[in-house]
Amino acid sequence: MLVKNTWYVAGMATDCSRKPLARTFLNEKVVLFRTHDGHAVALEDRCCHRLAPLSLGDVEDAGIRCRYHGMVFNASGACVEIPGQEQIPPGMCVRRFPLVERHGLLWIWMGDPARANPDDIVDELWNGAPEWRTDSGYIHYQANYQLIVDNLLDFTHLAWVHPTTLGTDSAASLKPVIERDTTGTGKLTITRWYLNDDMSNLHKGVAKFEGKADRWQIYQWSPPALLRMDTGSAPTGTGAPEGRRVPEAVQFRHTSIQTPETETTSHYWFCQARNFDLDDEALTEKIYQGVVVAFEEDRTMIEAQQKILSQVPDRPMVPIAADAGLNQGRWLLDRLLKAENGGTAP
């Protein structure tokens, strides 16, 4: 089951233009476009006349015109023109989905529009902060979004799936501190400190110091599918665990966002930020490619996992102690689903 009464990312703000864009969210076909005044709109991608996709049409000043028989639908989804017919039937309309543009992202609400409150959109992102250089990307997964969330909340796989990028030997054994906040829709914070440890290859490749480091991974997950990461490495003994960040420390901020496409496919947007050498384009490309390589390592494993789950959906997974973080995440997600099915907010 998929949570509907929540804000999902529908894309980067730059994805939406005067050219119709077809996407699927939570098994629903949606068309995204901008009106003549630049306002982003999300409508059901299905003309109510003969069920042709509106995304094959054209955006005009009055709205989007279906290419099959020429009906025009405005930004609210109402039909405002039928070629050759003056009277418009009262049922000639398509569903409009609430859509908000914030932090350089498009946020869509697929559930009950009466419950869509933009104030509920996660606000603690680094996108657009002048002291951070942010670069974004997109990956399409042939896998259920929960498998991606499980992977992100699981630190121990770093040693095995990412031995040459993000992982170190200590990643497999160090236990995290897990804090669960059940106010509102909930939040999960997972913290790990690696003191006097080796840096990962990704950090080592950009660090301006050598030797051992005090490394941190602080993850904040907001259900159903948004993860903010604060990661970095500082020279050992320079006060990083107490909050001090010396100038030579390597600091990254990362946002990972998943939106279910179907039960077995997912959208994945990410924003990678750093606060050093902001104008170094060669370094930007180096870091970006390193992140992409690590994500492809994850995707290979997760998509293979989905294939097996699709073949034997009733085969149980046997939990181990290292699953504590992802199990807490699943608990919060189940809580949202139960609240939605019961018709009350958590």
Swiss-Prot record:
<dbReference type="Pfam" id="PF19112">
    <property type="entry name" value="VanA_C"/>
</dbReference>
<feature type="binding site">
    <location>
        <position position="49"/>
    </location>
    <ligand>
        <name>[2Fe-2S] cluster</name>
    </ligand>
</feature>
<feature type="domain" description="Rieske">
    <location>
        <begin position="7"/>
        <end position="108"/>
    </location>
</feature>
<keyword id="KW-0285">Flavoprotein</keyword>
<dbReference type="InterPro" id="IPR044043">
    <property type="entry name" value="VanA_C_cat"/>
</dbReference>
<dbReference type="GO" id="GO:0051537">
    <property type="term" value="F:2 iron, 2 sulfur cluster binding"/>
</dbReference>
<keyword id="KW-0408">Iron</keyword>
<keyword id="KW-0479">Metal-binding</keyword>
<protein>
    <recommendedName>
        <fullName>Putative toluene-4-sulfonate monooxygenase system iron-sulfur subunit TsaM2</fullName>
        <ecNumber>1.14.14.-</ecNumber>
    </recommendedName>
</protein>
<dbReference type="GO" id="GO:0009056">
    <property type="term" value="P:catabolic process"/>
</dbReference>
<keyword id="KW-0614">Plasmid</keyword>
<dbReference type="GO" id="GO:0046872">
    <property type="term" value="F:metal ion binding"/>
</dbReference>
<dbReference type="InterPro" id="IPR036922">
    <property type="entry name" value="Rieske_2Fe-2S_sf"/>
</dbReference>
<keyword id="KW-0001">2Fe-2S</keyword>
<dbReference type="Pfam" id="PF00355">
    <property type="entry name" value="Rieske"/>
</dbReference>
<dbReference type="InterPro" id="IPR017941">
    <property type="entry name" value="Rieske_2Fe-2S"/>
</dbReference>
<feature type="binding site">
    <location>
        <position position="69"/>
    </location>
    <ligand>
        <name>[2Fe-2S] cluster</name>
    </ligand>
</feature>
<keyword id="KW-0411">Iron-sulfur</keyword>
<keyword id="KW-0560">Oxidoreductase</keyword>
<keyword id="KW-0058">Aromatic hydrocarbons catabolism</keyword>
<comment type="subunit">
    <text>Homotetramer. Part of the p-toluenesulfonate methyl-monooxygenase complex TsaBM, comprising the reductase TsaB and the oxygenase TsaM.</text>
</comment>
<keyword id="KW-0503">Monooxygenase</keyword>
<comment type="function">
    <text>Involved in the toluene-4-sulfonate degradation pathway. Does not discriminate between the sulfonate and the carboxyl substituents and can also be involved in the p-toluenecarboxylate degradation pathway.</text>
</comment>
<feature type="binding site">
    <location>
        <position position="47"/>
    </location>
    <ligand>
        <name>[2Fe-2S] cluster</name>
    </ligand>
</feature>
<feature type="binding site">
    <location>
        <position position="66"/>
    </location>
    <ligand>
        <name>[2Fe-2S] cluster</name>
    </ligand>
</feature>
<dbReference type="InterPro" id="IPR050584">
    <property type="entry name" value="Cholesterol_7-desaturase"/>
</dbReference>
<dbReference type="GO" id="GO:0018652">
    <property type="term" value="F:toluene-sulfonate methyl-monooxygenase activity"/>
</dbReference>
<keyword id="KW-0274">FAD</keyword>
